[in-house]
Structure formats: C-alpha cells, structure tokens
Amino acid sequence: ASFPLCLLLRDKGFNTQIKTHLEIDEKNGINCTTGSLGHGLPIATGMAFARKKTKKKGRIFVMISDGECQEGTTWESLLIASKHKLDNLIIIVDYNKLQALSKINDALPLENLEKKFKAFNCHCIAIKKGHDFKSIINGLKKIKKDKKPNVLIVHTVKGKGIKEFENDTIWHARQLKGEEITIGRKRLNLK
C-alpha cells in the first residue's frame, strides 16, 4: 500500500482517511482488507497461488499480527503455501507480543515463532529492530525465490515512540483525546 504520511496526521488523528480497518483502495495498493483476525493470510495465499498458476509475475505482500498467529487459518494457509511452493508470498509478522487485551503468551504461547514458521517450510528472516527502516529494507532484500514462502518476523514495540503508551494494551483500539494528543505529538516530534 502507498499513501502520504499526512493522511495519518490530518486533523490530529481525527477524521483521517486511514481507519482502523482499511477500505479497499486499489489505486494505493490496498487490494483487500479484513477485520477479523486470521483472514489476511488465507486471502494473500489465494492471490499468490492464482499468480503462480497463471504465470503472472509479481509478489503478494501481507502483513499480519502475532495475534493472527494464534488462528488456525493462518497455519492452514501456510500448509497450502508450502505445498504449492509459493515463493511469491511475503508474510510480514508484526511481533510486538501484545494483543487487544493481554500479552500474547497469556492467551496462547507463541515462543519460538521462527521455528514454527520453519516447521511449515518457510524461509524466515528475523528483524530485531522493527522500528528501523534500514533493518526492514535489509530484511526485504533477503527474500528468496527458493520455492518457499518468505516470512519476515519484525520485532516491534506496541506504541513505540510515546513512552506513556508503549507496551500498554489499553492503547490497542483507543482513540487519543485532548492532552493525550498533545503528549503523543510532542513525543513523536510533530507540530
């Protein structure tokens, strides 16, 4: 997807075009959106499979959360992607170890996430500095065309950059208001 940063910042975060659950916007590269956890990877797997079968070039990128790695459809999709050697499928996992209401491991343990993906015959790239664009770009450069799905496990901190919000599940879906907006903008060096 591609959109200007100003859309995220317009009206102090209110009335922005960027919503919690995006709408389809093919012009800007958003070909599909989901709301419920675990639906993104099955759709992306189908898109990658269709491209492979019709011999169309290009790759399918999908971003999923670590919470989605607790959904059965995620792992079923990996079985399919692996069986059909979908090396045109690039899965980016936002691994912040938190979900809406608790820590990931409190709900369902996900230790050794990289080993889990490798067990499903995926090529894995761990990005320890998930907020560093150079690290992410270097990870993307390591994507292989070796008949395996590619998975980038991007280690992040929920709420990064605003110390009052970091690693606090209360901010999962809560909209900022009043002084919180001022604090957030100050911490992110925004005017």
What are the language-model segments listed below?
Residues 71-96, 151-154:
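A short alpha/beta connector and helix-capping loop motif
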Residues 58-62, 89, 146-154:
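Generic beta-sheet signal
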Residues 133, 137-191:
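Glycine/aspartate-rich loop-and-adjacent alpha/beta segment that forms the canonical ThDP
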Residues 6-9, 73-75, 101-105, 137-138, ...:
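Short acidic, glycine/serine/threonine-rich loops at helix termini
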Residues 13-20, 81-94, 118-122:
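A glycine-rich helix N-cap at a beta->alpha junction
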Residues 1, 64-71, 95-99, 131-133, ...:
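Acidic, glycine-rich active-site loops and adjacent beta-strand->loop/helix elements
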Residues 56-57, 105-139, 190:
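Conserved thiamine diphosphate
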